[in-house]
Every structure is written in structure tokens, then in C-alpha cells.
Amino acid sequence: MKKYLLVLFMISALICHAQQKTVTEKDVLLAMDKTASDLLKNSKANSVSIGIVKEGKTYTNHYGEIDKGKGNTANNNTVFEIASITKLFTGLLVTQAVLEKKISLDDDIRKYITGTYPNLEYQGTPITIRDLVSFKTAFNKDLPDTAELRKNFNDTSYLAFKKLAESYSREKFFADLKNIQLDTLPGTKFKYSNGSIQLTAHILENVYQKSYETLLKEKIFNKLGLNATQLNVSKDVIIANGYNAKNILMPKLSDNLWGAAGYLKSSLGDLVKFITFELDTKNKIVAESQRNLYNSNTSWNGYFWDYIMVDNNGQNCRKHGGAFSTQNMMIVYPERKLGISVIVNISDKNTSEELEKAIINLSTALLPKSDLPKEIYGYKVQNDNVVFTYKHDKGLNSDLVKSVNVAGSFEGWNPRDKNYLMIKKDQATYELSVPKSRFEKDKTHLFKFVINSTGWAEAPENATNKENGGDNNLILKI
């Protein structure tokens, strides 16, 4: 009997494996080359660096040149400003403090701030550490306050931003912190704030009685072997040049506070080590840093991620970093053992959009492809009803799926439409039966499945009712 069950299990495993097309090393390298070619053209960057960690194997490559006409192609040791990727490192320090029980997520942040701040509460409700790491402090402004500078943003605005950063001291920071007002209940509204990250560094210094820079070295850099990653670089370290869209050499960032929001410099060689760490789902620090701290039914932020969501490839975490001269983006799919970092040495108003497009396209090329038979996918017509069916990959954590919706041209592409909320049939299957009369006959209707209201599922490669080009929507016809 045991032997029979073992054979049955092996057959089942083989069938499940057969439903996924293998992405070869050649596929990875070709996808990197295509992504770089497109990104060099679309972003107008001189240089593109791509790092990939896939199922434990690392791939890196560098394209173009740092300075136009000089032929100085980047390499794995080239040091770049990584800007807001720094926030992930700050988040990891808080994660360790929580796991070491030095702080609690539900602690009032004022417990760890030097001085008295009666203003850091809203109608008696204080800001907690949980609110702080989730960008939900309810601060009514950033520190320093850059609202006026952003109103009249132009090609030379960076000069004003740099001047402000150079003159903004810790003394000024704490004076301004006393004037912060909370505009809503902490923990209820996402609001990106660099000042809250700088405050986090101060809290960490008080908790550990060590400098933020020392904590980075002891708790992250040394443990992960990040030899090129530094907060305050040595005089002999050359930081890669970067440019704006007019190919004007741009200055490096300045920071007289703690540097916790965006002052780190690193290399692609170090960033792929960092990605390898972030893909280790068995590591308690990693698991906690990516955790859904509010049990959100949609997306969440873990510890200072831009956002973490669930789609048909499971959980994925994203972070963007933008300096005056460079931008970079990182994405990790822990359940798929895939992580990517892309760096460009240009920073302009369209750069982040091109970066995101590039990294999503690259991810799509590298993620497993369903090897299902060529057939209509996602729906069937039964009598007077259209029955939609979504099946989540059984190799992924189905507990992360809180809801699945059908969103389409027939209901305004609303991923939260309760009339198109699917019913869970088993651990991985969702169905929805809709009267056929809702769909105009002989008309092309487009749709997608959306997980947790935010994760738009990609159509299987072999779906015969998939759009060619565009958003690769699924097609429904009555």
C-alpha cells in the first residue's frame, strides 16, 4: 500500500511539473539582452545593469556605457546610488529589533524618541512601530517639507532639493517634528514619507545605543558579505556618473540626517546577494520583513516595501529607488524563487515608468509558463450562463489568496465589483456563474482575473482566447 501511494505521489508530481514549461539559461540570457536593448532605447539611459537570481543561480550583465563615448561599461563592482532601496535595509534593522524583542510592533514610537512629542497622536491614538514601517504615520508633511518645491518641478529643481538637503540638520529635523500634525488616524492611510524613515533610524540608535551606520554594518553588510555597500563611502570609492534626459551630468544625493531613507551606495554584485537573501523564505528575518502586518485583504508594505501583492505567481515584493542621477527597481517573487534588480544611470520624469515596464516584462519572460493544452481558458458557456473559472497554482500558498474577481470591459474593469466576486470551490479553484444575457451577443468582451483586488493574473501562454499584444487580456464571445 505504501509503495502504491509513493508511485501515485510521484506520478502526480510529474504531472504537476509537466504543466510548467522550463525556462532555460539561454532563455534567461536572451530575455536580459532584449530588456536591456528596449530600456536603453526607451529610457535614453547610457547604461543599463541587470541582475537576476533564479532558483538559486545568479545572472548579471551590463550594457551601454556609463559616460557617452568613453566605452566605460559598468561591471559587478561598479558603485551606484541606490536611493530608496536603502529603506529595505532600514526595514531589516527594525525587523531584527522586533524579532529580538527589543521593540514591539504595537509600541508607541514616542517610547523610543528623545524628547516629548504630544503632537504625535491623533485623538488619543499614537503612532505605532507597525504604522511607522508601513508608511501609515499620518504625518501631514514630510521632513524636510518639499511640498512647495514639488509644485513647480522643472529641469533645475534638483538644485533646490540638493540645497535643502545640504542645509537640513538633525536639530532642524527635531524642531520640525514638534510641529508635525497628524491628518488622520495612524495606521489607516498610506502616505510615503522620507522623514518617517529618518525617524526610524533615530529610534534604532536609541534602541541599540549604536549608530545607524554601525547597525547596518554589523547586522546586514557583514552577515551578507556586502563588501561594496556603504552609507558614507570611502574617499577612494568612485560612484558611477548619472545623467538627466538632456545628458547633463547630475549631482549625487546629500543627506545630513541619518541617510536611512535613500543614502546607501551599492553594486550589482551586492544587490544580487541581497536578492538571494530576500528569496530565502525560511529565514525568519526575511519572512517577517515581508509579512502582511495589518492582515490586509489587498496589498501591503511589510517593512518599508513600496508594495507587496499576490498574483498568479504568488507573493511579489517591489521597491523603486530614484536619485538625481540614477534609478533602480527591485522585484522578488519568493514563491517562484525569482528576483531581479535593474539599474539605469538616468533619472527623469519618465524613467520610473520605463523601468517598471522593463522589469515586469522581464519577470513575465522568466516566470514559469503553464503548459496547458491549446484551448479556451477562463470560461465556458453552460446553458444560459457564462461560468468563469480560475485555478491558482497548487504549488503556491493558497492562503495568500483572499479573493478573486473577474474584471472586464463588460463591467468597467473594476477589480472590486462585488457582482463579479468569484466563489471559492476548493483550496485552489474559484468559480462564478453569470447570466449570459449580461453579455452582448457577437461582441468581443475582454477580461482578466484579479487576485486580492490588486494582482492582475496573466493569461496562460496556450490560451486560444488571448489577445495578441496589448495587455494580453482574455477574450469572451457569446
Which residues fall in each region the model found?
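Catalytic loop of the DD-peptidase/beta-lactamase superfamily, centered on the K-T-G motif
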Residues: 20-64, 111, 217-218, 222, ...
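Extracellular Ig-like/FN3 beta-sandwich strand-entry sites
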Residues: 85, 442-444
